[in-house]
Amino acid sequence: MLAPAYTVAQAPPEWKDDFADHMIGAWTLTGPVMGHEAHHEVQAEWVLNYQFLRIHEKTAASAPASERPYEALWFLGYDAISERYVLHLLDVFGARYSETLGYGAREGNSIHFVFEYPDGPFHTTYRWLPETGAWQWLLEQKDKDGKWMKFADFKLTRASPKQ
């Protein structure tokens, strides 16, 4: 009897992460990005057999008309072999920036991700604030002189239930 030339990979067990579970649900995101105030809606849910937390971010319908529209899908997962979080960003800026994955480690109530983009490193930190039940997303990039600068500093609060 001949054995098949390949074997079907089995899906890993569901990824259970109590920390990431805090992000499940609907959120209101506000804060500065590149000197302008952002007003976004965020929805997070487990997808793909609980292998990823899909985070859908988009400009809120109630945002000022002057705000530049933005939309992104973030996929947060965990690589148990490498013992690190993985963050994949897909957004309106296209495929060039989606080529780079962010890798992160959890420290206390934060996950600090490093993205090594072709034009320089970029940091994204997700910080859970248990005392208020909110999140902070801090995004930083290096300027031309090699100094870290804030790109965005967002606060996420639970969205009010829709009437």
Question: Locations of the language-model features?
Answer:
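Hydrophobic small-molecule pocket/channel-lining residues, especially in calycin-type beta-barrels
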Residues: 6-163
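Bacterial N-terminal signal peptides
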Residues: 1-5
